[in-house]
């Protein structure tokens, strides 16, 4: 594709009022667009007309191919990207206001002409009010999404599409599910407004491209199969997965392939497309993955990728840039599906370790972990550290991933492979050479998988057989003598102001720490994850780094991820967005509530990845391992009632409990057993697993009827019903609800947009959004809200259904 120019927004005048974002067509336009802007005087129609003429002049410049600011300088987007003849983003809104024709048809009386001029002046005034709102500092990404969803004016929608370029990338990324869902399920005007931004960002970021491709596939899956195949979402997804959106200034990277060893495998069964980073390994696979694009027969069969791949020597095609990452993800998902077929937890764990050991032979490669927030290459998976998590029917598992951070994923060389048995010397870090490979050696170790889709067939991978590996000496410059230095030397020693502490305080704190060192869990074959999750994160990082052949590198990082197969994480993603929005609201309103949103990657309608919460174990694991009440466990971990550590942990518990109680009430979160509530090392509780929210409940049993889960054990940790911390808890609940309802629209629109075209169980019934709005109690006074909070706390604490559900989980799943 060539350079892209975003057409200016077209704001068409109409004789009818512009619909408000809230959808109240009967209300005054001015009351909607000036809400929250402050006092704005009613402008004279002539002034409005003059302002419109100025905008028209800018539009004429825009159509002439000139994009300049009011100061005459080339424009730069707010997100830091230059215009570079692709994106035109004016300092003032690039809005085109089309005036009605001045010439009247023959026979029209002069009174009609006057009426037309009057309507034109009124429309111009209304458009000026809208422009003033769009130009104001109060116009943020949340308002832009609201107008894009609610407005029926193509001109307004096109203008908002242009304005997306002027917001920060991370602000727009938060609403990516909403943007793509609107693109798939709403009318063409909305789709046309959104597409230029999506295409532009896909050219910039490979991770953004992956996120878009995965979400487009997942949100299109609710459509009928015949409609889905020809939908706009499917077409955009194919465009993203092709090479057409690869940055134009980057040359196509040609894979460096070594002759395959004579293993007796047919070409269709060679699944490992090798780069020089691992070309020294002689690999024999008895697997049966999908045919890769390196097979010339497949190139003619595959509809999705044939148009975007180029033939090389009539035998090989250059892999599209997302292909290695897609196969990496596919491999992780296939492991989860195979684990689910095994009967015992111990067998699953052993199989998981073996599978990941095989996966390591394909690393390093040009792949990354999408849940991370920085550019990196995956170099190794410490397979012995992986654990299978608790699940009755499925086999979610937790892995740790070693990565090397880099400045730019696309342009940085893939790190050279270092064998596990490489002996490292004790030379100083100054003698550390750059361990990399040449530009020609950067082809990913994962082969292209054309038939990658959301159906079960595309995910299926036959069991991998034995893998025989020979490791001759690897030529990696002078990396044989890489120095080994301590983790302490890697930690940056930033200069800090001296802090003076009394010797008595130091002795007291040291004695408290020695007396109350956090306990370690015992290994349980039925729950192997408990020990792994209980280990402090920094200790785990140190231990894995010491045993890693890449641990000596200063840009080495350790990440973790939970891989889930057979679960629809689209509701989890929706819950993450709501939690993130509430967290931002409470920070803005300075309410000290604490919640921990964790990242979600939706891969398909039944698979995904989750960012683990570090230094946290479930309350079920706490009770099972310690055989103590929650309060006694706090005393064991943090010291007696009067210690600083206990008081700090108690405050953290109260602030997090209040935050999650409000979340559970607003979203109607169900399935709140102790396996889905974590407790971290600082005393916070963290709710996980938001698979049942809003209109859905487990098996539609309707067990949990209370507003949220508040057990007597929770109250005991707070100091009892008459304690100050319990009163503090109720005060936080009230403050949090008051703050949340001030920003109700920001929360509701996240949910409302995702309901469009969705078949998710959380949206069953026609009253989901109405009930959500009612839970904000906009009509209540603060005194009435205080009474409501008291009633909800009392009702939840005395709820018999909470006790029944906990008993049900204990009897059926053994959850304490």
Swiss-Prot record:
Catalytic activity: a 1,2-diacyl-sn-glycero-3-phospho-(1D-myo-inositol) + ATP = a 1,2-diacyl-sn-glycero-3-phospho-(1D-myo-inositol 4-phosphate) + ADP + H(+)
Membrane topology: Peripheral membrane protein
Protein keywords: Acetylation, ATP-binding, Endoplasmic reticulum, Golgi apparatus, Kinase, Lipid metabolism, Membrane, Mitochondrion, Mitochondrion outer membrane, Nucleotide-binding, Phosphoprotein, Transferase
Residue numbers of Phosphothreonine PTMs: 263, 438, 517, 519
Amino acid composition bias (Low complexity), ranges on this chain: 10-29
Compositionally biased spans, kind Polar residues: 278-297, 306-318
Domain PI3K/PI4K catalytic: start-end pairs: 535-801
Location relative to the cell: Golgi apparatus; Endomembrane system; Mitochondrion outer membrane; Rough endoplasmic reticulum membrane
Record's protein name: Phosphatidylinositol 4-kinase beta
Organism: Rattus norvegicus
UniProt gene name: Pi4kb
């Amino acid at each position: 594709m060539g350079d892209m120019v975003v057409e200016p927004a077209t704001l068409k005048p109409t004789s009818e009022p512009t619909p408000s974002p809230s959808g109240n067509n009967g209300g005054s336009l001015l009351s909607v667009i000036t809400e929250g802007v402050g006092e704005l005087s009613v402008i004279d129609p002539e002034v409005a007309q003059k302002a419109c003429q100025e905008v028209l002049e800018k539009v004429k410049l825009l159509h002439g191919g000139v994009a300049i600011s009011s100061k005459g300088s080339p424009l730069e987007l707010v997100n830091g990207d230059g215009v570079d003849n692709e994106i035109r983003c004016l300092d003032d809104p690039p809005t085109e206001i089309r005036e009605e024709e001045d010439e009247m048809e023959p026979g029209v009386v002069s009174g009609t002409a006057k009426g037309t001029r009057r309507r034109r002046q009124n429309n111009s005034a209304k458009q000026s009010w809208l422009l003033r709102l769009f130009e104001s500092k109060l116009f943020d990404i949340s308002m832009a999404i609201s107008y894009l969803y609610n407005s029926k004016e193509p001109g307004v929608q096109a203008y908002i599409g242009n304005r997306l370029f002027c917001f920060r990338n991370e602000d727009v990324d938060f609403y990516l599910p909403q943007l793509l869902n609107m693109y798939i399920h709403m009318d063409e005007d909305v789709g046309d407004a959104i597409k230029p931004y999506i295409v532009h960002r896909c050219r910039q970021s490979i991770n953004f491209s992956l996120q878009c491709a995965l979400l487009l596939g997942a949100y299109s899956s609710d459509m009928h199969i015949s409609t889905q195949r020809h939908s706009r979402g499917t077409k955009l997804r194919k465009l993203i997965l092709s090479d057409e959106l690869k940055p134009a200034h980057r040359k196509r990277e040609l894979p460096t392939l070594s002759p395959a060893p004579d293993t007796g495998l047919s070409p269709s069964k060679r699944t490992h497309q090798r780069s020089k980073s691992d070309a020294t390994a002689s690999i024999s696979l008895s697997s049966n993955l999908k045919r890769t694009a390196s097979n010339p027969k497949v190139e003619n069969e595959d509809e999705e990728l044939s148009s975007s791949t180029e033939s090389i020597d009539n035998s090989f095609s250059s892999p599209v840039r997302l292909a290695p990452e897609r196969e990496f993800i596919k491999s992780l998902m296939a492991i989860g599906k195979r684990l689910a077929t095994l009967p015992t937890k111990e067998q699953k764990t052993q199989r998981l370790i073996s599978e990941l050991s095989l996966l390591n032979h394909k690393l390093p490669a040009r792949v990354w972990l999408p849940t991370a927030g920085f550019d990196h290459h995956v170099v190794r998976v410490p397979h012995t550290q992986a654990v299978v998590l608790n699940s009755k029917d499925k086999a979610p598992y937790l892995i740790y991933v070693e990565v090397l951070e880099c400045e730019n994923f696309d342009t940085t060389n893939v790190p050279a492979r270092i064998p596990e048995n490489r002996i490292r010397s004790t030379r100083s870090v100054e003698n550390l050479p750059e361990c990399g490979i040449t530009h020609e050696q950067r082809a990913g170790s994962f082969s292209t998988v054309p038939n990658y889709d959301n159906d079960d067939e595309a995910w299926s991978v036959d069991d991998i057989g034995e893998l025989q590996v020979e490791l001759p000496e690897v030529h990696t410059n002078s990396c044989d003598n890489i120095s080994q230095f301590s983790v302490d030397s890697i930690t940056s020693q930033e200069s800090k102001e001296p802090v003076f502490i009394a010797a008595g305080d130091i002795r007291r704190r040291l004695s408290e720490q020695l007396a109350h060192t956090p306990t370690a869990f015992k290994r349980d074959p039925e729950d192997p994850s408990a020990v792994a999750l209980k280990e402090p994160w920094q200790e785990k990082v140190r231990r894995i780094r010491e045993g890693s052949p890449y641990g000596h590198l200063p840009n080495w990082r350790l990440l973790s991820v939970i891989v889930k197969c057979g679960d629809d994480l689209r509701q989890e993603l929706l819950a993450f967005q709501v939690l993130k929005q509430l967290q931002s609201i409470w920070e803005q309103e300075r309410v000290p509530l604490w919640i921990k949103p964790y990242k979600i990657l939706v891969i398909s309608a039944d698979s995904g990845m989750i960012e683990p919460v570090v230094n946290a174990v479930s309350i079920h694991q706490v009770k099972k391992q310690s055989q103590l009440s929650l309060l006694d466990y706090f005393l064991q971990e943090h010291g007696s009632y009067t210690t600083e550590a206990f008081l700090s942990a108690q405050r953290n518990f109260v602030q997090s409990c209040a935050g999650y109680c409000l979340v559970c009430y607003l979203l109607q979160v169900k399935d709140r057993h102790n396996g889905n509530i974590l407790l971290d090392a600082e005393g916070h509780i963290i709710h996980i697993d938001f698979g049942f929210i809003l209109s859905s409940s487990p098996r539609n049993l309707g067990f949990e009827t209370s507003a949220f889960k508040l057990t007597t054990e929770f109250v005991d940790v707070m100091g009892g019903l008459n304690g100050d911390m319990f009163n503090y808890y109720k005060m936080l609940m009230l403050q949090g609800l008051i703050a949340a309802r001030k920003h109700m629209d920001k929360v509701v629109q996240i949910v409302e947009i995702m309901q469009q075209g969705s078949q998710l169980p959380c949206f069953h019934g026609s009253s989901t959004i109405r009930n959500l709005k009612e839970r904000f109690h906009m009509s209540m006074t603060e005194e009435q809200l205080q009474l409501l909070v008291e009633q909800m706390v009392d009702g939840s604490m005395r709820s018999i259904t909470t006790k029944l559900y906990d008993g049900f989980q204990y009897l059926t799943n053994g959850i304490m």
